[in-house]
From Swiss-Prot:
The gene is lpxH. This is UDP-2,3-diacylglucosamine hydrolase. It is an enzyme of class 3 (hydrolase). It catalyses: UDP-2-N,3-O-bis[(3R)-3-hydroxytetradecanoyl]-alpha-D-glucosamine + H2O = 2-N,3-O-bis[(3R)-3-hydroxytetradecanoyl]-alpha-D-glucosaminyl 1-phosphate + UMP + 2 H(+). GO terms for molecular function: manganese ion binding; UDP-2,3-diacylglucosamine hydrolase activity. Keywords: Cell inner membrane, Cell membrane, Hydrolase, Lipid A biosynthesis, Lipid biosynthesis, Lipid metabolism, Manganese, Membrane, Metal-binding.
Amino acid sequence: MTTLFISDLHLDPARPAITELFLDFLRTQVPGSDALYILGDLFEAWIGDDTPSTAADAVAEALHAVATTGVPVFFMPGNRDFLVGAAYAQRAGFRILPDPTVIDLYGQPTLLMHGDLLCTDDTAYQAFRAQTRDPAFQAQFLSQPLAARVAFAQQARAASHARQSELKQGDQAQFETVTDVAPAEVDATFVRYGLDRIIHGHTHRPAIHTVQAGGRTCTRVVLGDWYEQGSVLRVDADGLALEQLAL
């Protein structure tokens, strides 16, 4: 049996081919698995469970169909969809996990994260993250009319794209540092949790890294994004493998 991990699909009506690839993945590759874990950024944006979206409806229906076959589905919010709530989770048949979460993966304790908590060199983002994860902020935001939430999301996305563009046009080494995990934070996280494996997404740099932390040899698995293709991590009792899914 196999456990599947995905992240950073960034599903968006503007990219229907990726949504179709994901729906096909759910129909053809997930049934019979031990579990499916979605480690954040399933959607490009999420401003409340009450937002009308035919694409989100189709995704919820497909995920619920998977869950009804007996495959448990878990969702960990990312930086784009941290407002996914209990109403959508019920429709989709998944359980929302806190970030981070430790699971027993075929006998090996494994830390699951979206990954943005490891990017501590991006101090501006970490401040924004702390603000937007505050329950009081979220309650106030979700109480606003839909039009106001849409406007806020558009402004936030424009600011994010402008900052990314500014970083890319500047020092390339600085761009790579700010947009990737901080090695010191990775080491500290391994030591803090006392385990030897982390699985995360967020950085869109799929790879399997071997690092030394706390006097132990540890593994950090980075999931891939779903922009030009799909990406899935398959884990079983014998090991793990990152795979691409062609459009």
